């Protein structure tokens, strides 16, 4: 996640849109979109300079010729009442902070998870092995559950785990797996414990919880369930764009996508004397799906919500939205109180609260079950 409000806390932060950035005409260029219809060719270093100044964007260099961003989404009726409380509560009871701490300790031990680096490839391979182990342990592969690599033209692959249902319509939970040190993207130390190791291991633990339900494991849920771990989010939502563009091109139907980007930092709220809460993103999301998410939180989670905005192209839910799929995003806190260590070598596990991450996992289990089962 790379968010304007976090960097706005610095008095030295200035608007890049009005700045003149020198261009090295010999360098490889990338086409980025900073706002709807506002595009610019930049070098890779200019991309990172924009990020350092707090400007988010889509990297649309590899977008298909003639692609048009969706301006409307299909009208989808979401449940207005809770229907599977017993099943969800049984799954929630299996969620483990110890599992998440173990997984995040390992995931953040890679030197970095930069999408072009060997470390990014290695971390993705390790993460996919954990997903496969969860599927194997549940016996779900016998009923068609699987995990696959979604390959890109860079080192790190995205990961897609699928639990088939009676319908091909998909309920998606996603998180980006890559990390970055913005001062030295390729070689710098970037543990990325919160951004976004926290989201990655939170949805992994939620997957384990969901796989405790035999109706889901045996493919008897009404809808298909997918868990995604995206590559290259920090470079312009690259992995999620590729996946959702592919889904659009192949006619896949997505009932809803819930994004989890940073799930573990609460100190900003505590220091302000605020009640620890979820940050509900209200811009560039589907309002009806977000209303459904609020219902899930009120039923299955023990903390309240605060409305907040994160801007254009701030994280992977925006890729779903851009391709016409309804998406929602729940952050660890209001955007202006996010973890200040993101994108540095100080983004370590020491600053995270695993009870808060469990609340996110409870949300995911409830979201998936109530929407898919």
UniProtKB/Swiss-Prot annotation:
GO terms for biological process: proteolysis. Disulfide bonds join 310-314. GO terms for molecular function: aminopeptidase activity; metal ion binding; metalloexopeptidase activity. Zn(2+) 2 binds at residues 195, 234, 343. Zn(2+) 1 binds at residues 176, 195, 261. Keywords: Aminopeptidase, Disulfide bond, Glycoprotein, Hydrolase, Metal-binding, Protease, Secreted, Signal, Virulence, Zinc. Its EC number is 3.4.11.-. InterPro entries: M28_fam, Peptidase_M28. Gene3D superfamilies: Zn peptidases (3.40.630.10). It is found in: Secreted. This is Probable leucine aminopeptidase 1. The lineage of its organism: Eukaryota, Fungi, Dikarya, Ascomycota, Pezizomycotina.
